[in-house]
From Swiss-Prot:
The gene is CIN5. The keyword Iron does not apply. GO terms for cellular component: cytoplasm; nucleus. The modification Phosphoserine is found at residues 85, 89, 196. Residues 181-202 have a biased composition (Polar residues). This is AP-1-like transcription factor YAP4. PROSITE patterns: BZIP_BASIC (PS00036). One of 8 closely related fungi-specific YAP proteins (YAP1 to YAP8), which all seem to be transcription activators of the environmental stress response and metabolism control pathways and to have similar but not identical DNA binding specificities. SMART domains: BRLZ (SM00338).
Amino acid sequence: MLMQIKMDNHPFNFQPILASHSMTRDSTKPKKMTDTAFVPSPPVGFIKEENKADLHTISVVASNVTLPQIQLPKIATLEEPGYESRTGSLTDLSGRRNSVNIGALCEDVPNTAGPHIARPVTINNLIPPSLPRLNTYQLRPQLSDTHLNCHFNSNPYTTASHAPFESSYTTASTFTSQPAASYFPSNSTPATRKNSATTNLPSEERRRVSVSLSEQVFNEGERYNNDGQLIGKTGKPLRNTKRAAQNRSAQKAFRQRREKYIKNLEEKSKLFDGLMKENSELKKMIESLKSKLKE
């Protein structure tokens, strides 16, 4: 059967209209298949121009079935609070935290324009009152002020300990906007940072660290400049690498072996000189004795 369904923008106005068309035939009589069997019968003809359905008319071929009634929930728009676009930007964070629009939580609110339409339920006071209601633009001045106060204070931990607790939200944009150098004072160096770190230690630990920093091991045969850097024969600072340290230790061992060998040679030379002197004296004595025997 041909059924036309007309809707007036609401699912309650389903008005099925039945078109008479015989769907039965006598099964006892055989039906011959001819060329005209494939031609549609006149009752199923096309809709005339004056009877053509408008945009809200749907033509379907189905049995006499009543379509179910569907209630569509209201969809959140840009004007409603708590709307989040695809890019992730929030139009109103305070409305988003204080209200929840869920399609499953709906209540039937009467509408003057038509029957009941399911609308989303607004649930308030879901966030504890202790949390501040700040948006992204109100957070940036607070972060910038805290970073500026860090420059005027040598010990940044004192201001943080005495400052009142204010919870805030940090986004990726505000976190990356502050450079890493802004967390340290402008006049800070690695040496000053190390000294400031030692001031927070106990007295015993501070004394041990100061002794370990002040003590410098000077090996024999090594020279250091005013900055405490190891220098070579030319006065240039030596490279502080593992390979260079191995080379310096090998050269030092070679110098020690050479000095020891030289000392041994000097002792042997002195002994040889004494023996030569004694030998010459003995020769003189032998010659004198020979001369006496001849006389």
